[in-house]
A protein has these predicted regions:
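C-terminal beta-strand-loop-alpha-helix "lid" module of Rossmann-like NAD(P)-dependent dehydrogenases
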Residues: 1-246
Length: 246
């Protein structure tokens, strides 16, 4: 009888665990849908800004821009360090989520150094910081802890840091590393150039543009600087949401 009672309790425990697991799956699926929807909405916004920045690059006279603004469009400006913005997670147990990014960053650091280009690092996420600091602590300009839900203040701080370093003429180019979400099982390690802005080919312009006509005059002393500000924060928020979804 004791054996039968133990078996009944065991069955009851398993059923209870199954219910809890099912509830957790439903909650996780709902969270993923929300994050995915937000990421997709921001994709459109980022695409529009990228297309406008590309249009500025192709049509504006660099001589009319400030030294700060020129760095975002003129690929010939060189001599200062390259800034790498590294997006990782706070915790482990993510498979190759962090390791792919860390390997890519370390590989690029070596490549830049071989070309006699100095490197500065901005790292978001404890796993990236822990993996990089032992070897490249002297390159780390800033490290940001990512709170569980409120990534926006961190994104704003990173944007301000990038703008500040550029305005102070401490860097002349910047790239960002993060994971692009594809589906619940697949994410792709992605490296993008924040600046100088990469020139899009015709097919990319058509794919990215949500504007009926992007040919217009850029007037006003602060218009380009304001556009740069929106563009940089848009890129960073996009990377954060893609990482979160992944």
């Amino acid at each position: 009888m004791s054996g039968l009672k133990h078996l009944r309790n065991r069955v009851k425990s398993i059923k209870s665990t199954q219910k809890i697991t099912k509830a957790m799956q439903l909650v996780s699926a709902a969270k993923l849908r929300r994050i995915k929807d937000r990421a997709e909405a921001l994709d459109d916004y980022s695409s529009i800004l990228t297309n406008i920045m590309n249009d500025v690059k192709l049509n504006i006279n660099f001589m009319n821009l400030s030294p700060f603004e020129q760095k975002f469009f003129n690929e010939d400006i060189k001599g200062k360090p390259h800034l790498c913005v590294v997006m990782t997670s706070e915790r482990g147990l993510c498979g190759s989520f962090n390791s792919q990014i860390i390997k890519a960053v370390k590989r690029d650091i070596v490549k830049y150094q071989e070309q006699n280009v100095k490197v500065k690092l901005i790292i978001a996420g404890k796993k990236g910081y822990d993996a990089i600091k032992s070897q490249y602590s002297d390159l780390i300009e800033e490290y940001y802890h990512i709170t569980k839900e409120h990534y926006l203040p961190v994104a704003l701080e990173i944007k301000n840091k990038i703008i500040s370093l550029t305005d102070q003429d401490k860097i002349d180019s910047c790239s960002m590393y993060y994971n692009e979400f594809k589906n619940a099982l697949v994410q792709v390690m992605t490296k993008v150039s924040i600046f100088p802005v990469e020139t899009l080919n015709i097919s990319e312009q058509k794919e990215n543009s949500k504007l009926p006509d992007s040919s217009f005059e850029y007037e006003g002393s602060n218009l380009v600087s304001s556009l740069i500000d929106l563009y940089v924060i848009g890129m960073i928020k996009h990377a954060f949401l893609q990482n979160k979804a992944s």
